[in-house]
């Protein structure tokens, strides 16, 4: 087994599809949903930066904050959305992915971020999800339903209809990723080490 910590950067306060809740109410509800869903997946700890939804733009500042979290938690692997995915239009996902990548390669520097008092730490790998160029496929056959049980807890985000569409999509995607392998459903990640993330022009082909 392993210990998993969820870091949620924004507070989700733009996520009320009904338009009936105020910002603080929806933020509190989104936090509750995140924790409930995470517990379904076996997440042990939760961290929230509580930045307003749709507000992210300062990659260096966010990267420094994430680096401090990395140095405190000392993770083996960092998971984040792939910020270089073509046609990804969700700015908060893009900025968070870029900041996480910057933090991943910089958290081992003794003076990064400026003024830090935490000890350097280098995670072994960063794994980008929602990627178009996976280099690692994990067997998720036995955990596929657990994933959707967790997703279903995000009631402010996913209607039954949308959840059903995602089930079809991820099932088809999982079958495609599992082709030629000895399992039925796969999930793809772009997994890179720290040396791949700076001045390494072959990284897209790895």
Residues of each region from the PLM?
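Active-site rim/loop-helix segments in enzyme catalytic domains that contact anionic ligands
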Residues: 1-73
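Metal-dependent de-N-acetylase/amidase catalytic core
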Residues: 57-206
């Amino acid at each position: 087994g392993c210990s998993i910590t969820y870091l949620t950067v924004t507070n989700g306060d733009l996520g009320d599809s009904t338009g009936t809740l105020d910002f603080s109410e929806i933020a509190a509800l989104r936090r509750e949903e995140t924790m409930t869903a995470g517990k379904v997946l076996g997440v042990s700890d939760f961290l929230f930066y509580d930045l307003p939804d749709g507000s992210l733009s300062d990659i260096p500042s966010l990267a420094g904050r994430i680096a401090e979290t990395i140095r405190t938690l000392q993770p083996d692997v960092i998971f984040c959305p792939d910020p270089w995915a073509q046609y990804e239009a969700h700015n908060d996902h893009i900025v968070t992915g870029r900041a996480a990548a910057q933090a991943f390669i910089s958290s081992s520097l003794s003076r990064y971020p400026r003024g830090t008092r935490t000890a350097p730490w280098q995670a072994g790998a960063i794994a980008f999800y929602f990627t178009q160029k996976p280099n690692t496929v994990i067997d998720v056959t036995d955990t596929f339903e657990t994933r959707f049980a967790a997703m279903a807890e995000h009631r402010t985000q996913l209607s039954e209809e949308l959840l059903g569409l995602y089930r079809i999509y991820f099932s088809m995607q999982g079958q495609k990723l599992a082709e030629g392998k000895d399992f039925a459903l796969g999930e793809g990640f772009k997994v890179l080490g720290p040396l791949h993330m700076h001045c390494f022009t072959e990284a897209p082909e790895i």
